[in-house]
Amino acid sequence: MKTLSAKPAEVQHDWFVVDATGKTLGRLATEIARRLRGKHKTSYTPHVDTGDYIIVINAEQVQVTGNKALDKKYYRHTEFPGGLKETNFEKLVAHKPEEIFERAVKGMLPKGPLGYAMIKKMKVYAGSEHPHAAQQPQVLDI
């Protein structure tokens, strides 16, 4: 019996919606990364994008454990000398709640063209509304 290798034209990408209300950031991000990569499918192939589309709603209501809300630092650089900026989890949730999920999940995906295609399949929204009703996403309880 031969090992089956998925071909890009044969892969079916489903749409799922995940509610982040009251969920822990890391545990939710690992499951999202696994589904974006397609490792939950029997047709998983490392060099083919077999993952699903994930819509994350209520990103502003995600939680972290311990003192990470104040202690966890996020860094960015303005590309000017001395332009290193830092913020903590609490401030970033108030300002850009979508960026928290993008940073958490992006670090769990492969680097390179395939990983960049996978991260584009994740749509994150701060509130409970999303514009993807036409795709008829299924509710995914994590």
UniProtKB/Swiss-Prot annotation:
Question: GO terms for CC?
Answer: cytosolic large ribosomal subunit
Which GO biological process entries does UniProt record here? negative regulation of translation; translation
**S-S bonds:** none
**Pfam families, alphabetized:** Ribosomal_L13
Q: Which residues form a coiled coil?
A: none
Matching SUPFAM superfamilies, A to Z? Ribosomal protein L13 (SSF52161)
Q: Which superkingdom does the taxonomy of this entry point to?
A: Bacteria
Secretion signal: which residues? none
Quick check: keyword Nucleotide-binding in the entry? no
Print the keywords alphabetically: Ribonucleoprotein, Ribosomal protein
Q: Name one GO molecular function term.
A: mRNA binding
Query: Gene3D superfamilies from the entry?
Result: Ribosomal protein L13 (3.90.1180.10)
The record's annotation in InterPro entries points to: Ribosomal_uL13 (IPR005822), Ribosomal_uL13_bac-type (IPR005823), Ribosomal_uL13_sf (IPR036899)
Asked if Hydrolase is a keyword of the record, the answer is no
Give the function comment from the record: This protein is one of the early assembly proteins of the 50S ribosomal subunit, although it is not seen to bind rRNA by itself. It is important during the early stages of 50S assembly.
- Subunit structure comment from the entry: Part of the 50S ribosomal subunit.
Which PANTHER family does this chain map to? LARGE RIBOSOMAL SUBUNIT PROTEIN UL13M (PTHR11545:SF2), RIBOSOMAL PROTEIN L13 (PTHR11545)
Annotated family = Belongs to the universal ribosomal protein uL13 family.
Question: Under what name is this protein listed?
Answer: Large ribosomal subunit protein uL13
**In the record, what lineage is assigned to the organism producing the protein?**
Bacteria, Pseudomonadati, Pseudomonadota, Gammaproteobacteria, Moraxellales
Name the gene behind this protein: rplM
